[in-house]
Amino acid sequence: MKNERHVLIVFPHPDDESYCVAGTILAYTQRNVPLTYVCLTLGEMGRAMGNPPFATRESLYAIREKELKRATNILGIKDLRMMGYRDKTLEFETPGELRRVIQKCVEELNPSLVISFYPGYAVHPDHDATGEAVAEALATIPENKRPTFYAVAFANNHEAEIGPPHVKNEVKEYVPKKLEALQAHASQFATKVTELKREYEDGVTETVEWLEREPFWIYPFKDKNK
């Protein structure tokens, strides 16, 4: 992984950062690369309440905020920005609202790399709305000044439609911390982390690949095809 001037990560929910890009985050923060994480909601409408349940619909908001702060501390993120949008409603925000928020962050931080979801290939409506807003915000920047957009994709049909990933970050050395960050999101991954650890120790191919390598697609802005 090359050094970056500043890395901006934009995801909609607490745990997206730990589930999708924890190793990549650690690779940057442990080299003291400036990194900002913009989390648009606190995932308060999530269905998971812990296993066994310890959260309620009323308490989940505060619990997930604490989990997010714990996880980002583990990942070495010093600049966490919680934007306070309502979970599961991002697709219904006023047109241009999310784009403007992201534009302001880009103008302030001048990142060389932005990481978010690949719009249309990230399964959840909030994921797709976030990725679309990031793409729209970055598209307003002239190509020679635009940061690279690393997009995360995992819809069932994604490789058939957008091809194999352009980048696969090798993050084996960060697996223990990656699992620790996931464990911090206890309301969402209480039993999953135990299962992942067991599968990793047993050498389950899919789990080893998921924990040790993080794939990204470089988002294709239309002006690149001119």
From Swiss-Prot:
Its EC number is 3.5.1.-. Disulfide bonds: none annotated. It is an enzyme of class 3 (hydrolase). SUPFAM superfamilies: LmbE-like (SSF102588). InterPro entries: BshB2, GlcNAc_PI_deacetylase-related, LmbE-like_dom_sf. One of its GO terms (molecular function) is hydrolase activity, acting on carbon-nitrogen (but not peptide) bonds, in linear amides. This is Probable N-acetyl-alpha-D-glucosaminyl L-malate deacetylase 2. It comes from Bacillus anthracis. The gene is bshB2.
